[in-house]
Amino acid sequence: MPKTQYTKTALKEAIAGKLQRHFACEVEDATKDQVYEACALVVRDALTEHMIETQNEVEQDGERQVHYLCMEFLVGRSLRNNAYNLGMLDALTAALKDMGFEMADIFEEEADPGLGNGGLGRLAACYMDGMATDGVRGTGYSIRYEHGIFKQKIVEGQQVELPDSWLSTGEVWQIPAMDETREVKIGGTVDTYFDDNGKLVVNYHDYTPVLAVPYDMPISGYGTNNIARLRLWKAQSPIALDMKLFSSGEYLKALEKHALAETISMVLYPEDNHREGQSLRLKQQYFLVSATLQDICAKHKAKYGTLENFAHKHVLHINDTHPTLVIPELMRILMDENDMSWEQAWNITSQSVAYTNHTVMPEALECWPVSLVQELMPRVMQIIYEINERFCKELWNYFPNDFQKISKLAIVADDTVRMAHLAIAGSFSINGVSALHSEILKERVFTDFYKIYSSKFCNVTNGIAHRRWLCEANPELVELIESKIGTGYRTHPSELQVLNNYADDKELLDKLGEIKRHNKQRLADYIKAHNGIEVNMDSIFDVQVKRLHEYKRQMLNILHIISLYHKLKDNPDMDFVPRTFIFGSKAAPGYAVAKKTIQLINSISKMIDNDPAVRDKLKVVFLEDYKVSLAEIIMPAAEVSEQISIAGKEASGTGNMKFMMNGALTIGTMDGANVEICEAVGKENIFIFGMETPEAEALAASGSYEPMVIYQNDPVIRRVLDQMIHGFGDGVDYTDIANLLLHGGNGGPADRYMSLKDFASYAAAQERVSEVYRNQDQWNRMALINIANSGRFAADRSIAEYAQNIWRVKTNFAF
C-alpha cells in the first residue's frame, strides 16, 4: 500500500487550504465545483509527489522504458479513481461528510475527459492503470484534444453532435511542462545532396512550424507509489500575432496561422470523407509521433550522449496503425539529425517498435494518398519510399517473379501508403488482441506476412482495469466478494476463481440477486431522470452499449425487438418474461447508416412507450452521450450482455469483460474474446448463437447469400422489415435501412453482416435467456460463475504478458 497514510483531519485541512488559496473562500461558502477542484488539487499533490519519485527511480535504474502511443485514451473521471488507488477514498469521503458535502455529488462535478471514443481508447487507459500497478516503466502519449470526440444530444430521435468542453474540470489533472515544448515541421520542401565525404545532406525549408506543448496526467497504480505518466500534446503556433493586420481590421487573416496550427489538437477523429479532413487527421498522427519521438530522443541523448543504444532502453508501442509514422520519423531523426547510416538506423528502429493490430476490417487498415503524405511530410515520404524499395527487394527473395504478390504486400502501391504494411515491416512484434483475432491475422488478413515473419506474430488478449470496473463501480458486490475471499484479488485477479467454490451457496446467490436489483434500481432512476421512461424492475435488463457500427449488429438486436413487439401485439396475454432493452452508442458524424440506426432505435422506443398494451412488458431505452461515467452505472446493472457481432469481425472487445465481471450473462457469437469467455465459464454459462467464423467467411466468399430468400420464406422477418418500410407512427421512413438489408447499397452486398442469416439462431438463444431467467437460482449461479472466472481478463494480466513476451521489461505481477 502507499507509504502515505491519509487521515480525515489532514484532508479536511488540505481541502480548506486549497479553497482559501485558489478561491478565496471558506468551506461554508464554497460551491460544489470549487470543492471538486480543491479535492482534485489535494489528490494531484499526492500524485505529483509520487510521480517525481517514480521519475527519479527511472533515471537511476536505467531500465528499459515503454512508450505507448495511441490517438485516444478514454481515461474516465480521475478524482475517485486516484483517491481509490492512493488509499484515501474512505478518508476523503469522511472529510467531505464533515464539511457538509456528499462524495457522490462532488464526483458528479467532474466531466469525462474527451480524449477518446471507444474500445481502443478505453483499452489504452486500462493499460496505463495496469502499467502503474504492475510497476512497468511506462508513459502514454496522445493529443490534448480541446473538444474531444463530441457531446451527443438526441433531438427528435436523432444524434446531434456538440462540442465537448471537458477541460473546464479536466485541466486540474494536467501538469504543463512548457520547458519540454517541441517543434513539429509540417509541409515544406526537402533538398538532398551528397557532400564531399559522400554523406547525404538534407535541407528542409519553407515548412510550417507547429509547437507541441506537453501536459502530463499522472496515472496512479493501486497500492503502490508507482505512477505512470500520460503525456498529452497541445498544438500551438509559434508565429506571433500579426498586429499590423489586426490593427487594420483584418482580424481573421491575422489569426489565420494561429488557428490552422491549433486545429491539430482541437477535435478527435475529424471527418475524413474529404481532403481537408484527411489532411487534418494525418497532421494529427504526425504531430503526435514527431513530438513524442523528439521528446524521447532528446532525453535519451542528454543522458547517454548517443542514440546507438536506443533500442536497448526503449520500446515504442503503437496501438493500432494511427501512430505508424513513428517508424519513418525515427529513421529521420537517426539519419538526418544523428548522422547514422540507413542500416544502423533501420536496425535500431526495427528493434524498437511493437505493433498491436485491433481490426480485421479492410477499411480500418489505414491507407493514405501518397500525394497527401508528400505534401505534409516530404522527408518522411522519401524515407517511406526507401523502406518500400528495400522491403520489396526482400519480398522478391520469398516470392521471386511474383509481381502481383509483391505489389499486394508492398508498403507503397496504387498511389497509397499502406500503414499496416509499414507497421509490419518496421516492427519486431505484431500482436492480435484475442486468440481468435490473432489466428485470423495469421491465416487471413496477413497470411503472406506471417509466412515470412512468423516469429513476429503473437497474441495478448485484451484486459480491463478490474479495480475501476468492479471495485469502484460495484461496491456492494465487492463487499460480498471480499466477505468470502478477502482482498487479494485486487492485485491478483485470478483469486476470483475461489468464488467457484460458492456456486451452490443459496444464501450467497440470493444476496447476489439483491445486489443486482439495487444496481438495476440505480440505473432505472437514471433512465427516469434522463429519458422520462419508467422501466419495469422485474424485467431483464438487456444491454448493448458500444460504438455504433454495422458489424457490431445493433441491427440484429433491433430486428428481434420488433419481432417481440409483434408477438405481444398478437397475443397480449402470452407468458412473456419482461425485457428492457438498453442501448448506448455514438455514431461517427459522417456515418449516415449508423446515425439512422440511432433514429430507428428511438422511433421504436417511442412507439412501445406509447402503447399501453406492451409497455409494461417491453421497453427500449437509448441513453445519450455514452461515456465511461455512464458505463460505470450501466455495467453493474446489466443482466444480459449483447456481444453479437458477426463472427470473425470483432478483434476482441472489452465491454464483454466488464459485463462478465459484474455478473451479466453474455449472449453472443463465437467472436473476439467471447470465445475465451466461453472457454472460461463453459458453454452452459453463456448463450452462444449464430455462425462461426469459417462458416460466415465461406458464405460471404461464395457470393451465394441471398437475404431476399430469407425475407420471402420467413414470415417473422418479412413482417419486421415491412414495418420498417411502413414506419413506426412518427412519420420517419426507414426504407433505406430495409433496402440495405435486402438489396445492399453503397457498393456493398445485401445484409453485409448477415443479420437476417443469424436471426433465427439469435431469437432461439434469446428464448433460452428468458427460460433461464425464470429460475433465479440458476441465473444467479451462472452470474457467479461468470464473476469467478473473469480474473483472466484483467489488464494486470495483459500488461504482464506484454512486459514478459514483447517489451522484455520487469513487472511486479505474479501469474
Enumerate the predicted regions with their spans.
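A conserved ligand/cofactor-binding region detector
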Residues: M1-F815
